[in-house]
Amino acid sequence: MSSIRSLFADHTVAILCEGSAERIVMEKLLEGGLLPFSADDVITDEWDRPTILRMPAKKFARVYLELAYSQPVIVLRVLDSVHEKFMLPHAFREIPVVSCYTRPEIERLIILHEDWESEWQKVKKRTKPSDFCKERIDSRIKQEDWLRQYWSTEALCAAIRAYSHVHQQASEDEHTLADLLP
């Protein structure tokens, strides 16, 4: 596991999240002071949330990068697909983009937290983590209110660290959420 924490020093951070689950995870970590930056260093979305839902790079640049910030910007993407491209327009190519992957799905953290690993291993080739969790715990696992109540900061950190031990990285350059933790 490599640490990428130092990349965020002296930067304004844009946290782009694939969906609601990723948003809640990142907001919980930010609220708990577990990320290498504070809420004061984050670009907020139009509702003043410290995370931004995923959007095409061109739209993201138009909406957020044409504004003036007190420090250089760094983009932190949290998503499950290592194949998704995110190419900023030419005028913004000097902005660093760091991707943290939660493949195959972020619901994998729930499986680890609930200690369902042995059951999951038996069905993982034919069942998505989200479907596996919906069958066992709650059909609302993608809803923000449910996720906010489900995850404590401590449980979330433990699941993220457990994931880093069972996850097979596709390459040395692949980062996970554990790389952001102290």
Model-derived segments and their meaning:
Residues I15:
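Conserved SAM-binding loop
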Residues D48-R54:
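Short, conserved secondary-structure transition motifs
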Residues M1-T12, R23-W47, K58-P182:
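C-terminal accessory helical subdomains adjacent to catalytic cores in phosphodiester-
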Residues E18-G19:
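Helix N-cap/beta->alpha junction signal
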